[in-house]
């Protein structure tokens, strides 16, 4: 027969996607079921959380699904997203389920604003594909003077990752002012290394409720 080119389809989640009032100290295990058996590929490189957790969630297979265990104490009144990248693939032909996300909140609501953008190399006028975009709530970090140490002193409130064409969509933003940083993740370790990673900084604050 013809080669299977269709990625897995989600058929069930527990708790549901966009669940609110998740316990910060004892978050539940998350079960996601698919219409076929799946494999988990390149989890260390593909999976990330927004905001970052001190310990990455563990993801294991169970039947036709996966079980996600959160190993960190969560922040109160915070919207979290577990981004799986292309790590979830079908068992037979390794067709990836691109950009799968599981979103939940430890508060009463899920932050729902977003920003789309593009990361580019200012010297070569080309897109930067292996890049992460960090959003810091402006009121929570110092205003830089001579030297900007934000990336080393603070943890981002929202994290996005650019596609191969440099385009990114940052989701689950609040209607507040953000300072935005983008860096090229040369070593695929999801950490900014100033000796090898390029970095760019938006020269103004950004508020998704006031700007497109």
Identify what each model region corresponds to.
Residues 98-99, 185-212:
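Structured interaction patches on ligand/partner-binding surfaces of diverse proteins
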Residues 1-172, 177-179, 199:
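Acidic, low-complexity Ser/Thr/Gly/Pro-rich repeat segments typical of extracellular/periplasmic
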């Amino acid at each position: 027969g013809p080669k299977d080119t269709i990625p897995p389809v989600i058929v069930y989640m527990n708790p549901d996607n966009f669940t609110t009032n998740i316990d910060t100290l004892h978050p539940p295990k998350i079960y996601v079921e698919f219409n076929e058996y799946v494999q988990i590929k390149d989890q260390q490189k593909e999976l990330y959380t927004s905001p970052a957790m001190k310990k990455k969630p563990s993801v294991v297979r169970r039947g036709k699904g996966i079980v996600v265990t959160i190993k960190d104490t969560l922040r109160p009144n915070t919207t979290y997203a577990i981004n799986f990248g292309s790590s979830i693939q079908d068992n037979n032909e390794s067709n990836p389920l691109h950009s799968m996300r599981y979103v939940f909140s430890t508060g009463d609501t899920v932050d729902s604003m977003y920003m789309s953008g593009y990361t580019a190399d200012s010297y070569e006028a080309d897109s930067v594909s292996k890049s992460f975009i960090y959003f810091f709530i402006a009121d929570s970090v110092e205003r830089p003077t001579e030297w900007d140490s934000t990336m080393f002193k603070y943890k981002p409130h929202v994290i996005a990752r650019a596609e191969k064409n440099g385009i990114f969509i940052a989701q689950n933003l609040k209607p507040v002012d953000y300072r935005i940083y983008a860096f090229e993740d040369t070593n695929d370790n999801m950490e900014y290394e100033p000796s090898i990673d390029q970095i760019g900084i938006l020269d103004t604050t950004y508020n998704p409720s006031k700007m497109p």
